[in-house]
Curated annotation (Swiss-Prot):
Subcellular location: Plastid, Chloroplast
The reaction(s) this protein catalyses: pyruvate + ATP = phosphoenolpyruvate + ADP + H(+)
Metabolic or biological pathway, per its Swiss-Prot or TrEMBL entry: Carbohydrate degradation; glycolysis; pyruvate from D-glyceraldehyde 3-phosphate: step 5/5
Identification of the protein by name: Pyruvate kinase isozyme G, chloroplastic
Site (Transition state stabilizer) location in chain: K306
Keyword Nucleotide-binding assigned: yes
Binding residues annotated for K(+), in chain numbering: N123, S125, D156, T157
UniProt keywords, alphabetically: ATP-binding, Chloroplast, Glycolysis, Kinase, Magnesium, Metal-binding, Nucleotide-binding, Plastid, Potassium, Pyruvate, Transferase, Transit peptide
Gene Ontology biological process terms, A to Z: glycolytic process
The organism of origin for this protein: Nicotiana tabacum
Entries under InterPro entries matching the protein: Pyr_Knase (IPR001697), Pyrv/PenolPyrv_kinase-like_dom (IPR015813), Pyrv_kinase-like_dom_sf (IPR040442), Pyrv_Knase-like_insert_dom_sf (IPR011037), Pyrv_Knase_AS (IPR018209), Pyrv_Knase_brl (IPR015793), Pyrv_Knase_C (IPR015795), Pyrv_Knase_C_sf (IPR036918)
Predominant cellular place of this UniProt entry's protein: plastid
PANTHER family linked to this entry: PYRUVATE KINASE
E.C. no: 2.7.1.40
Length: 562
């Protein structure tokens, strides 16, 4: 059993006569108290805990207020240690939402942000520049209206997709049926449809397995001519217009960045988006090419590589090293590789990103059923929880928010599952990257000890950063508490919205250290992010001195005083 504490302000409805026994307690918010004859119990978000003692109980207007509640948590074989649980603790795992017809209005973007969206994704496979421009303008309007909140913008390139042609009506494919793909444009008959890629003929061989629409249908390649690939249907279904085609175990020989992608990238530069998510990256050369272009444009945009092709797997280390982060795009990854490999690759990619201090996003099918249904499957809930437990910086919604019927419910489900999972994770007084910290530069060593101190003392971390680098290093040390990152750079504030456990806040820095710290604390108090009398760990990186002319690293533990 581990002892935990709830903070001042815990409210339970009950009659004053029941102060000694909470037998008359009722459900209020997410907290429910009940009573047994010998032992009181507390249920927090369906977690049963045994109450040890209640301090400072008093009744006001027939309500009970508990300033402090001590209770035991069933530890399932491990000790959680002494900690303080704050009811308004921010969620650490970030949420990426794809904006589409269901969510492109001003009202919906505001509601998504309030429900928990941290990053707005623009899927360049759909829509045009005019529609995406409206979304960008609305997100920027939101950011300007709420200074203490931020939504980052991610532009996701279409990439080199092999797509079937248009059909006047869906073609029903049946098991055992012969069906053909032609490189001639405009072909559409009951047994043949065109593809948009001339080298498709050269990319496939007899014996290959073609997957249609992410694996919804599959066909075996039997033979080919100069312009037709002849197949036999293995798993049938309805073939509609413009369906994505994959060859299991192979990637198309198309370039990772197409002409359309370059047009979209230029559009992103002009609109100062925060991230590019680059589709079907096969090697680090593509990343270097894009970064060189961005440097020539003086564009401060970070590059997220989407790991979704078979060719990318042997080059994972170099691809992630060259990038600013990665996305586990499980849809095409599961189409090009055996499906049973996807969970293992997800874990491997997350682990690699953590070791390289790069953010990682887990994407595809996370709440797919909520496109049409108001509640998720239990497997989907488990999927989110696993991604959080494995250490993903962010989880992503695609069709759920782009064109789904219940976009807000999907975000709320993702928010509460991530928050609940985070609350169950074992708290540690050490950093997961201790060995790496001692092998690298001073900044990493400094962040490691800052995180360890904050974990030991159960304090939030306040970091002042110009470039965001110290906040990022702190994030990858995975401190148990929140990292409040104050920066005087709006672009840095936007970018930090993606990082695990980081709450970015814009603030002009003063030459007076005490004045800057005082203003930061005042802002956090006003938002109830810290409370009076609480201790905080204050961090300033010597690599980017804020108050001193010379480089100085320092860590302070201070008591919050309003």
């Amino acid at each position: 059993m581990a002892t935990m504490n709830l903070p001042t302000g815990l409210h339970v409805a009950a009659k004053p006569a029941s102060l000694d026994r909470l037998s008359s307690a009722k459900n209020v918010g997410d907290l429910f108290f009940s009573d047994s004859r010998h032992r009181k119990r507390v249920n927090t978000s369906n977690q049963i805990m045994a109450v040890q003692s209640l301090e400072h109980i008093h009744g006001v207007n027939n309500n009970v207020y508990a300033n402090y509640v001590n209770f035991n948590v069933p530890s399932s074989g491990y000790s959680l240690g002494q900690e303080s649980v704050y009811l308004n603790s921010p969620r650490k795992t970030k949420i990426v939402c794809t904006i589409g017809p269901s969510t492109s209005s001003r009202e919906m973007i505001w509601k998504l942000a309030e429900a928990g969206m941290n990053v707005a994704r623009l899927n360049m496979s759909h829509g045009d520049h005019a529609s995406h421009q409206r979304t960008i303008d609305l997100v920027k309007e939101y950011n300007a209206q709420f200074e203490d909140k931020v939504i980052a913008i991610m532009l996701d390139t279409k990439g080199p997709e092999v797509i079937s042609g248009d059909v006047p009506k869906p073609i029903l494919l049946k098991e055992g049926q012969e069906f053909n793909f032609s490189i001639k444009r405009g072909v559409s008959t009951e047994d043949t449809v065109s593809v948009n890629y001339d080298d498709f003929i050269n990319d496939v061989e007899a014996g290959d397995i073609l997957l249609v629409d992410g694996g919804m249908m599959s066909l075996a390649v039997k033979s080919k001519t100069s312009d037709i690939v002849k197949c036999e249907v293995i798993d049938g279904g309805e073939l509609k217009s413009r369906r994505h085609l994959n060859v299991r175990g192979k990637s198309a020989t198309l370039p990772s960045i197409t002409e359309k992608d370059w047009d979209d990238i230029k559009f992103g530069v002009n609109n100062q988006v925060d991230f590019y998510a680059v589709s079907f990256v096969k090697d680090a050369k593509v990343v270097h090419e894009l970064k060189d272009y961005l440097k020539s444009c003086n564009a401060d945009i970070h590059v997220i590589v989407k790991i979704e092709s078979a060719d990318s797997i042997p080059n994972l280390h170099s691809i992630i090293s060259a990038s600013d982060g990665a996305m586990v795009a499980r849809g095409d990854l599961g189409a090009e590789l055996p499906i049973e490999e996807v969970p293992l690759l997800q874990e491997d990619i997350i682990r690699r990103c953590q070791s390289m201090q790069k953010p990682v996003i887990v994407a595809t099918n996370m709440l797919e059923s909520m496109i049409d249904h108001p509640t998720p499957t239990r497997a989907e809930v488990s999927d989110i929880s696993i991604a959080v437990r494995e250490g993903a910086d962010a989880v992503m919604l695609s069709g759920e928010t782009a064109h789904g019927k219940y976009p807000l419910k999907a975000v709320k489900v993702m928010h509460i599952v991530a928050l609940r999972t985070e609350s169950s994770l074992q708290k540690s007084t050490s950093s997961p990257s201790q060995s790496a910290a001692y092998k690298s530069h001073m900044g990493e060593m400094f962040a490691f000890h800052s995180s360890s101190m904050a974990n030991t003392l159960s304090t939030p971390i306040i970091v002042f950063t110009r470039t965001g680098s110290m906040a990022i290093i702190l994030s990858h040390n995975r401190p148990s508490s929140t990292v409040f990152a104050f920066t005087n750079n709006e672009r840095v504030k936007q970018r930090l919205a993606l990082y695990h456990g980081v709450v970015p806040i814009y603030m002009e820095f003063s030459s007076d250290a005490e004045e800057t710290f005082s203003r930061a604390i005042k802002l956090l108090l006003s938002k109830s992010l810290v409370k009076d009398g609480q201790y905080v760990t204050l961090v300033q990186s010597g690599a980017q001195p804020i108050w001193r002319r010379h480089s100085t690293h320092h860590i302070q533990v201070r008591k919050v005083q309003s």
